[in-house]
Amino acid sequence: MSLTRDTGLRDTGQKVPEPVEGPSRVSQSRVSIISQLTLQETWEEFLAYRLMKGRFNWHEFDEADAFVERKGYLPLANKIAEGEGLGLPTKKLVNKMGSGKKRVVYSFAPDEMLVLKLIAFLLYKYDDQFAPNCYAFRRGLKASDAVFKINKAIHGKPMWAYKLDIHDYFNSIDIDILLPMLAEMLADDLLLYHFFEKLLTTNLSISNGQIIEEKHGVMAGTPTAPFLADVYLKEVDRYYYNKGVVYARYSDDIIMFAPDYDTLQQYKDQMCHFLAQYHLEVNPDKEKIYSPDEAYEFLGFKCHGNDIDISEATKKKMKGKISRKARSLLRWSHKNHIEPEKAMKGLINYFNRKFFESDDPETLTWSRWFFPVINRTEGLKEIDHYLQQNIRFLGTGKHNKTNYRVDYEQLKALEYRSLVNEYYKSSTKE
């Protein structure tokens, strides 16, 4: 494939090439991922891994285990092996975390989603083709690794930083640009490439019960979308890695550092040029340059020297969510003549799940995302105080000093759990 002379990146104007089979292809010595979908031992390994990693609750595991035991995957796996595609995805709007905004996500039928999860699990064999500065959806790499490695790289150095967020990244990926990259990466598995080609070029979905035609990128919400999103910008990641730039990407969030403002501006201009080539847009509300004496924010963390806390943006989002949930519960309790204590208990239960123990094992709670990384608790204290205020508000209907008639012991009796206390408990366990 041709490379552009000025950037070293792929010429994105190319047509999708047909993968070429030949004696040098590793595919002849490997079993296609598509073929593995029909093997019970593959499914059993997949279920065991997800259970070990806490990505199933026991009810979900029992259902999935029964599905595998009766070989419920075989009809769909055989159809895929014969070259058939999946059904149409369903498009829906869901609330963005901590804001009143909506985002578009897609899903397939339950058995199709489970097959896509298995494919995503098996795709980790291509993990070594990504640059070390790409952290999202990598086996053995976490968001905390990005923060720790950045802090180590810039320790003691006055560095400028540029942070950006790609607008609607997953759903904006240009499939005509992605497919040649995918063809190259999956050159050893033509069956898998053709499965993705069919999946990604079917520009139909179901919205509100109606079939609509639209371009939907790699379809946010589907299990294979994170892998495809890593593939799409892997050459950009590699470009900055080869130049020795302190750089990290976690899906649509990117940050890079430079020793002076002019160099940072060059990196920024180059990144904007790359994103234009890939038909992507920067979210202007989430774009920021940090001077050397400022704390930088990335992936919900605020970092300054050796100090790591939750970011200002994270606190603002969570306060918005707490406030909206409290007002909603107050309206509900008034309308249905519910005792204030029940509304207070409802708010506590909701945020206990969000902070510590989600019903969805795929959801990253605060205790899993923030606690292993932060070493400051000011942000947690601020959220604790704000949540307590809103719990008391549900008890009195007012935001004033009368709220303190509901003392802390009453909150604890309703099973309120302090973020700060839980953080120190988790630190002691470690």
Where are each of the predicted segments found?
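Glycine- and acidic
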Residues: K101-V104, P132-N133, L164, E214-T222, ...
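Right-hand nucleic-acid polymerase module
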Residues: M113, K117, G209, E213, ...
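Glycine-/proline-rich flexible loop or hinge segments
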Residues: M52-A64, N95-Y106, Q129-N133
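Conserved polymerase palm-domain catalytic core
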Residues: K79, K92-L93, K149-S251, I255-F274, ...
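Non-catalytic, polymerase-adjacent accessory regions of viral genome-replication enzymes
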Residues: M1-P19, P23-L74, K398-E430
